[in-house]
Structures are given as structure tokens and as C-alpha cells.
Amino acid sequence: MKFILYNLATAKEPWADEVSELYKKKISFFIPFDIQSLKAKKSAREDADFKRNEESELILKNINSDDYVVLFDERGSVLDSIQFSKKVENILGSSKKRAIFIIGGAFGVNEEVRKRADLKVALSPMVMNHLMAQAMSLEQIYRAFTIIKKIPYHNI
């Protein structure tokens, strides 16, 4: 199995790149892992629906029918780290070849992506930018593996 994180972030910050590389390396210790930035065409901020649909189509084009899809979405289930680790463990026990983790664009994703997601997880009831969402999702994926493997990291 391979885990892939798709994002639509357009902003670049040195700290976010460092965090992403750090957690990519840590997660790759447990499973083949990659972070892929999907690039949608630029459009005006006023075209929120157009941009959401265009980015959602791009996401769907990069998902195979047999992938397990996890969508990080503010409307998803609120899980604690133990609950999330159990979901990751179930994914690992499935017959899927890839697990795709998705962080939507600035305007979120459309209903088609939500329907395609096998699991929808809220990182927080608060809204955050993509760089923060990516940092939090990477840390939680890593934390899930340390819980599953009983590696001292999660201290609750």
C-alpha cells in the first residue's frame, strides 16, 4: 500500500516546506508516502464555485476507482488521535493499493468529491489555511502510525 497526500495549496512558506519534508520522511519510515500538489488554473477569487468545481475535477482525475479516499474537511467527523489511528489501521488492513488523503482548495471541494470520500475527517471546527491543514494532517498521520506500532510519541 502507498499513502499519498494531495493538496491544492498555492502559497509557499519555508516553514511549511520544512514541516512537510520532516513528516514525509517520518511517515515514509512506516509506509511509502508522497505529497503531491495539484495545480489548477488560476481564476478570480470571485469565481468561488468555478474554482471549487475545477479543483474538485482535478482531484477526481487523480483518484483511482479502487483507492481509499480520506478527505480532510471542516464538515467531516471530529476524531481524536486514537480514533483516527484506528481508521488508519483499518485502511492498512484493507485490500486497497493506495490511500489518498485530500486537503481541498481555499473554497473546499464539491459534493462529488465528498461523495467519493470513504472517510471525511475534520481537523478542527475552526477554519485554517492550507499550510496549517497540511501540517496538522501530516502530524496526525504520523501520530497514527506511532499509536499503531506502539512507539512512544502519543502521551495520552
Swiss-Prot record:
Q: Which keywords fit this entry according to its UniProt record?
A: Cytoplasm, Methyltransferase, rRNA processing, S-adenosyl-L-methionine, Transferase
Q: Which reaction does it catalyse?
A: pseudouridine(1915) in 23S rRNA + S-adenosyl-L-methionine = N(3)-methylpseudouridine(1915) in 23S rRNA + S-adenosyl-L-homocysteine + H(+)
Q: Return the Pfam families for the record.
A: SPOUT_MTase
Can you tell me which residues bind S-adenosyl-L-methionine?
G104, L123, S124, P125, M126, V127, M128
Chain's role: Specifically methylates the pseudouridine at position 1915 (m3Psi1915) in 23S rRNA.
Please state which protein family the record places this protein in.
Answer: Belongs to the RNA methyltransferase RlmH family.
Q: Which gene encodes it?
A: rlmH
Q: Where does this polypeptide localize? A: Cytoplasm
Keyword Transferase in record = yes
What is this protein's record name? Ribosomal RNA large subunit methyltransferase H
Q: Name one GO cellular component term.
A: cytoplasm
SUPFAM superfamilies, A to Z: alpha/beta knot (SSF75217)
| Enzyme Commission code | 2.1.1.177
Name the PANTHER family on file: METHYLTRANSFERASE (PTHR33603), RIBOSOMAL RNA LARGE SUBUNIT METHYLTRANSFERASE H (PTHR33603:SF1)
Assembly with partners or alone: Homodimer.
Q: Which domain of life is it from?
A: Bacteria
Where is it mostly found?
A: cytoplasm
GO molecular function terms here? rRNA (pseudouridine-N3-)-methyltransferase activity
